[in-house]
Amino acid sequence: MDLFPVLKELAQKTPSKILLIVLDGVGGLPLEPGGPTELEAAKTPNLDRLAEESALGLLTPVYPGLAPGSGPGHLALFGYDPFRYVVGRGALSALGLGADFREGDVALRGNFATLDPEGKVVDRRAGRPPTEENQRVVAKLKEAIPRIEDVEVHFYTESEHRFLVVLRGEGLGDAVTDTDPQKTGLPPLKAKALDEASERTARLVNLLSERIREVLKDEPRMNGALFRGASKKPSFPRMQEVYKLTPAAIASYPMYKGLASLVGMEVLPVEGEGDALEGKLKALKENWGRYDFFYFHVKKTDAMGEDGNFHGKVEKVELFDALLPEILALGPDVLAITGDHSTPALLKAHSWHPVPLLLKAPYLRADEARRFTEREAQRGSLGHLRGMELMPLLLAHAGKLLKYGA
């Protein structure tokens, strides 16, 4: 159901402030039966105290049984139907990087990967190289591959193993399958067109993959590329129009900046490299008076899960917990903490499991949940929500929705 027409009628501007904190991939699983999840293993005294004052529940970001990507997971949290408002990873990276991304262009998100002599994937992320190494390799590709046939090829560094390619030329469609096999021990997949208009794009992507491998054959780790999320530039309703908010985003990684800008948030500058939690906290404090909705993104919980690093994910949760008192001191009227999907270290991948949701607001019914964990969230008064149901709840608790109906 598309609630946007209804919310557009009911939304009203108020001075109250909403803070949505997304701990990327926060949901987890025990490493062994009966053991703790990452959240249960973490020492989180500040989150524990907050949970006692808040309402908890579980949230299925997109749909039961579906393991969502960060794109649909976030869009649902922002109130956008992820089955209607579809955007590829390439477009999100292009928007987040501020790349020269024009109508008719096709953007693809790339991973530098390590391939063995037989062309099989050894490491899908090339050992997560420093961004400086990425920049060096991208410079090499820019010089060696300015175009494929008569189509311009534009390379951009994103971060670590991530990069962006923008294809510019005539007759390019974006209905193209990914080349990332999503596991090691297999060669990169061949891109395939899903419609007639995208046949040329698929062929060019395959040629580009071969050419990149030739250029990078002497690189010890970054000697191949995996592509996904081919997409053109989309146009979505803006949060200002639908919710009457003045929204801001605090994120470090281009994809999440792209998601935020796509729905109308102003992306605030963040000092520091990587997840830069201290820089994000500084940006939140310095801009607190200018906006009434803040999206605050924490990435490394997801990265540790994808690497299968259970204890690393525990540490990232604990690092966030240490910042929480300074965040709470700002006094948000409505605070929500949740995830865009689960990334259990046990699975080393996004999963279909619900994520915990914590909501603190003035008019909440008390519940029995005492920690921000998956098991405790099951006891909470919020029940089990879908991702798209979160934004109306935040708006209501912030006093930003009028009564519906007579």
From Swiss-Prot:
It catalyses: (2R)-2-phosphoglycerate = (2R)-3-phosphoglycerate. Its EC number is 5.4.2.12. Pathway: Carbohydrate degradation; glycolysis; pyruvate from D-glyceraldehyde 3-phosphate: step 3/5. It comes from the Bacteria. CDD domains: iPGM_like. Keywords: Glycolysis, Isomerase. One of its GO terms (molecular function) is metal ion binding. It holds the Pfam family PhosphMutase. GO terms for biological process: glycolytic process. Catalyzes the interconversion of 2-phosphoglycerate and 3-phosphoglycerate. Belongs to the BPG-independent phosphoglycerate mutase family. A-PGAM subfamily. This is Probable 2,3-bisphosphoglycerate-independent phosphoglycerate mutase. It comes from Thermus thermophilus (strain ATCC BAA-163 / DSM 7039 / HB27). The lineage of its organism: Bacteria, Thermotogati, Deinococcota, Deinococci, Thermales.
